[in-house]
């Protein structure tokens, strides 16, 4: 009798994706983040579902309902903080996953890479709208500032902003629709993730050496299932340490003050995972220019495959490109730091220099250094 796992229409899909999938024999722990992101997504959907059972998306009661979840619901505080800090873990995994793709040339699978960029935008949109829901000071003013950026679009900007708000300011209609979008987007993300995997499995995984691994494949199970299980264990350990020891470490204290349209917080800033983009936005004095730079800070990833000039796929054997990659990493950390600082000297000029460096590395230096490395190969 043939094994049901290989014949049953549903079991066959799971089998071909997670059991009998041929995988390169040399992929490192940097290839764990796909499964970790899947775990993060499932965790966020589950905790979010339980939060939605108690949350009310009304300006009068939203803040109180979150307080009620934390104080009165059985283990509500655990669910709430797992959801809030789960978003941070999600973004840590996302940034590491994208960084791995850049380092090892995984962007040479264009469909997989481009769907990944769409996924990144979708997760960022979801996180932004989720941050608005508790209706604290930073929720309200963050929503006001970020949605207002769309007014920089010529001709249709103002109408577009009022259309998104559902009125002339961020109010009840805005909160209700943000809750609706925040609820539906994770399911769209799940569907996109399935397509992301579909395209990945068309080509098979890349590997650290960047050379084809067809001659040396091993089954996904048990080798990589056990490896992913270890990664999952470490992820849950990190998340629960954060949740149980310092749940507010990555949050903003201003969000414990109920939203007040008449009182602006001294420093409006988003969650830490948006600070690098926020720093790029603020480094340009012109509003439309800032918005374009903000969009390009992520969209620049889409043209990375077109700028690949190296004869080698990954950076494993390219020390000059490696130096640039780690300079880019340091630059992003600098931007993240600047995004959380007030707009004053010397932070303004540091932010502007870091923003210029970010685009210079990706668009000019990396392709140029790759050409130099190609010529060095001839020696």
Curated annotation (Swiss-Prot):
GO terms for biological process: mitochondrial electron transport, ubiquinol to cytochrome c. It is found in: Mitochondrion inner membrane. Its cofactor is heme b. Keywords: Electron transport, Heme, Iron, Membrane, Metal-binding, Mitochondrion, Mitochondrion inner membrane, Respiratory chain, Transmembrane, Transmembrane helix, Transport, Ubiquinone. Heme b b566 binds at residues 97, 196. A ubiquinone binds at residue 201. Pfam families: Cytochrom_B_C, Cytochrome_B. It is a multi-pass membrane protein. The chain crosses the membrane at residues 33-53, 77-98, 113-133, 178-198, 226-246, 288-308, 320-340, 347-367. GO terms for molecular function: metal ion binding; ubiquinol-cytochrome-c reductase activity. Heme b b562 binds at residues 83, 182. Component of the ubiquinol-cytochrome c reductase complex (complex III or cytochrome b-c1 complex) that is part of the mitochondrial respiratory chain. The b-c1 complex mediates electron transfer from ubiquinol to cytochrome c. Contributes to the generation of a proton gradient across the mitochondrial membrane that is then used for ATP synthesis. The cytochrome bc1 complex contains 11 subunits: 3 respiratory subunits (MT-CYB, CYC1 and UQCRFS1), 2 core proteins (UQCRC1 and UQCRC2) and 6 low-molecular weight proteins (UQCRH/QCR6, UQCRB/QCR7, UQCRQ/QCR8, UQCR10/QCR9, UQCR11/QCR10 and a cleavage product of UQCRFS1). This cytochrome bc1 complex then forms a dimer. Belongs to the cytochrome b family. This is Cytochrome b. It comes from Lontra canadensis. The lineage of its organism: Eukaryota, Metazoa, Chordata, Craniata, Vertebrata. The gene is MT-CYB.
């Amino acid at each position: 009798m043939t094994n049901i796992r290989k014949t049953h229409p549903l079991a066959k899909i799971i089998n071909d994706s997670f059991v009998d999938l041929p995988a390169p024999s040399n992929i490192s722990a940097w290839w764990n983040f796909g499964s970790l992101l899947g775990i993060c997504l499932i965790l966020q959907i589950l905790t979010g579902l339980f939060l939605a059972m108690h949350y009310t998306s009304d300006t009068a009661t939203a803040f109180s309902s979150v307080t009620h979840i934390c104080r009165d619901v059985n283990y509500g505080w655990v669910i709430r903080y797992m959801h809030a800090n789960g978003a941070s873990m999600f973004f840590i995994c996302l940034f590491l996953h994208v960084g791995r793709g850049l380092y090892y040339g995984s962007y040479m699978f264009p469909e997989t890479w481009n769907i990944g960029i769409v996924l990144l935008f979708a997760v960022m949109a979801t996180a932004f709208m989720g941050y608005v829901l508790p209706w604290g000071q930073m929720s309200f003013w963050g929503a006001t500032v970020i949605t207002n950026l769309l007014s920089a679009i010529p001709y249709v900007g103002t109408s577009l902003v009022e259309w998104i708000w559902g009125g002339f300011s961020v109010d009840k209609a805005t909160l209700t629709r943000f809750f609706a979008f925040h609820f539906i987007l994770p399911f769209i993300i799940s569907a996109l993730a399935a397509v992301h995997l579909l395209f990945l499995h068309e080509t098979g995984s890349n590997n650290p050496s960047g050379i084809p691994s067809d001659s040396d494949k091993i089954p996904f199970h048990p080798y990589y299932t056990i490896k992913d299980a270890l990664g999952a264990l470490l992820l849950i350990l990190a998340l629960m340490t954060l949740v149980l020891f310092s749940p507010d470490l990555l949050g903003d204290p201003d969000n414990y003050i109920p939203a007040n349209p008449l009182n602006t917080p001294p420093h409006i800033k988003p969650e830490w995972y948006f600070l690098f983009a926020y720093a790029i936005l603020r480094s340009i004095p012109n509003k439309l220019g800032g918005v374009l730079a903000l969009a390009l800070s992520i969209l620049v990833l889409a043209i990375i495959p077109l700028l690949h000039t190296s004869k080698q796929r990954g950076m494993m054997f390219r020390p000059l490109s490696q130096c640039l990659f780690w300079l880019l990493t340091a630059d992003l950390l600098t931007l993240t730091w600047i995004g959380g600082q007030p707009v004053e000297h010397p932070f303004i000029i540091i932010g502007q220099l870091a923003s210029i460096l970010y685009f210079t590395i990706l668009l000019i230096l990396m392709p140029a250094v790759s050409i130099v490395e190609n010529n060095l190969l001839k020696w």
